[in-house]
Amino acid sequence: MTQTGATGSEPAKETARSSSADKSRPLPPADLAGVPVYCSWSGGKDSALALHHALRLGAEPRLLVTMLTEGGERSRSHGLRRELLETQAAALGVPISFGAATWAGYEDVLRRELVEAARQGLRTGVFGDIDIERHRDWVESVASAAGTRACLPLWQRSREALMREVLDLGFQAVIVAVREDALPPSLLGERIDAAMLRAFEAAGVDLAGENGEFHTFVVDGPPFSGAVEVDLGERVLRDGVWFVDLLPRHPSG
């Protein structure tokens, strides 16, 4: 894990970070203690694990930020229903906000969402990126343009180690999308386990799905007050990716 922006002396606390000169510099994860944060939120394993690490480091998550399709009904990245993400946020005990955008307008809308977070006093954002430099450059740029700074608790961790940690911590991650040329649609709705990771490794599939091989939705884990109950809906193929429609399970009667 890198310590971007760290120096040999202890960095100043959050009260001193709000100056225009340094508030947009990336924040070393070790400096999260006592810092109110927003979390970039897909609903999947990486954002959930980043949230867990932020909590363990003493951060105070105040808001989840999720991007939806232009109609505002499903998440832009994973195709998850808005209602499902709201149920997940309730189980985490963290409010959630949504921005709706086309892919072309994605960056502008996200920046506006982060500007609003900054207005609420949240000048640090937690992101779940692992080791792709162009992704890090992009999130740091967008966060900075909104007057906030990015913190990446998972940065440069081994992908295998992160996936083992997901399992060891008890996160329950359901496969909600698979790339048609990488994995079979029969995996949709399955929960990631050790046997699945071994199969991925044998097939040459990235264990963390960093190349878009698969996406997940986390239904339970350390930060959750209770499991998010779901049912499986129809499967659809869109632009070379299989998706399953995950439905929030409502109590009968």
Predicted features and spans:
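Nucleotide-activated chemistry modules centered on ATP-dependent adenylation/adenylyltransferase
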Residues: T2-G5, E10-G253
